[in-house]
Amino acid sequence: MRKRISAIIMTLFMVFMSCNNGGPELKSDEVAKSDGTVLDLAKISKKIKDAVEFAASVKEIETLVKSIDELAKAIGKKIKQNSEDLEVDNGKNNKNGELVAGAFQVMLTVKAKLEKLGNTPEISEELKGKITDSKSKCKEFVDKVKADSDISKAEATDEHVKKAIDQVNAPAGEKGVVELVKLNKSIGELLKAANAAAEAAIAELTAPVKAEKPSQNN
């Protein structure tokens, strides 16, 4: 995000330097392009800032959702002593309640962040629709997991938990994975739209001046 903000600042500087201040009287936060187009830098800068921050928030949510995949790798495992690897925990196999609780808490955090994101002012109807879809998919996952008696207990088995959170080894898992797959897809589409909105805001500032057509008079 820092790189993107730095690029925006540089773009603002370049636009300012390339604009001329001739023509109509301008306000302190306005500049004019060579074709006479007046840019409200304060307004455009805020629009870019808001769009970039929104996209960063969506990216954070996507990272949280994808972290479930990392938690799934620890199903039935323990840390191998003096190693950076995991190994099967024969003494605690089929006792994944705490692991599921961790994944569930991550998803509750995602749910809360999506709710907050939905209250963002001045976002497009497209983004509002995609947020609503992601909220719905998140709720479906949460509802599925919390209602499953095989999952909501300390002795949750490896097999059952894989069907809840392991997209790799149980892609059709009926205890939550199906809903998790849908949520991942929905969040991915939301992030794509958020990035597009940020790029559009930047493009509004950097749009090239239209070249004047040559005169047809001889």
Curated annotation (Swiss-Prot):
A lipid is attached at residue 19 (S-diacylglycerol cysteine). It is found in: Cell outer membrane. SUPFAM superfamilies: Outer surface protein C (OspC). Gene3D superfamilies: Lipoprotein, type 6 (1.20.120.240). Pfam families: Lipoprotein_6. Its main location: membrane. InterPro entries: Lipoprotein_OspC, OspC-like_sf. It comes from the Bacteria. Residues 1-18 form the signal peptide. A lipid is attached at residue 19 (N-palmitoyl cysteine). Keywords: Cell outer membrane, Lipoprotein, Membrane, Palmitate, Plasmid, Signal. It is a lipid-anchor. One of its GO terms (cellular component) is cell outer membrane. The keyword Transferase does not apply. Belongs to the variable small protein (Vsp) family. Genes for both Vlp and Vsp families are on (usually) unnamed linear plasmids in B.hermsii HS1. The Vlp and Vsp proteins are antigenically distinct proteins, only one vlp or vsp gene is transcriptionally active at any one time. Switching between these genes is a mechanism of host immune response evasion. This is Variable small protein 8. It comes from Borrelia hermsii. The gene is vsp8.
